[in-house]
Amino acid sequence: MAKEDVIEVEGVVQETLPNAMFNVELENGHKVLATVSGKIRMHYIRILPGDKVTVELSPYDLTRGRITYRFK
């Protein structure tokens, strides 16, 4: 997947699931299942319910995403 094909949106983490998966509600009201990107996992950045995050979505599957940034 090419980098320019991703859709970046902001959302709020609703629920923490096993294996570093999260239910995220996007700004437009949609809910997606998101996993943590490698850099966040590498640096042990904790993501908790209520955190505001940036999610990358593939145009092919808009129900799954990757968390790329957690706002402070």
Curated annotation (Swiss-Prot):
InterPro entries: NA-bd_OB-fold, RNA-binding_domain_S1_IF1, S1_domain, TIF_IF1. The keyword Lipid metabolism does not apply. SUPFAM superfamilies: Nucleic acid-binding proteins (SSF50249). PANTHER family: TRANSLATION INITIATION FACTOR IF-1, CHLOROPLASTIC (PTHR33370:SF1). One of its GO terms (cellular component) is cytosol. It comes from Listeria monocytogenes serovar 1/2a (strain ATCC BAA-679 / EGD-e). Belongs to the IF-1 family. This is Translation initiation factor IF-1. SMART domains: S1.
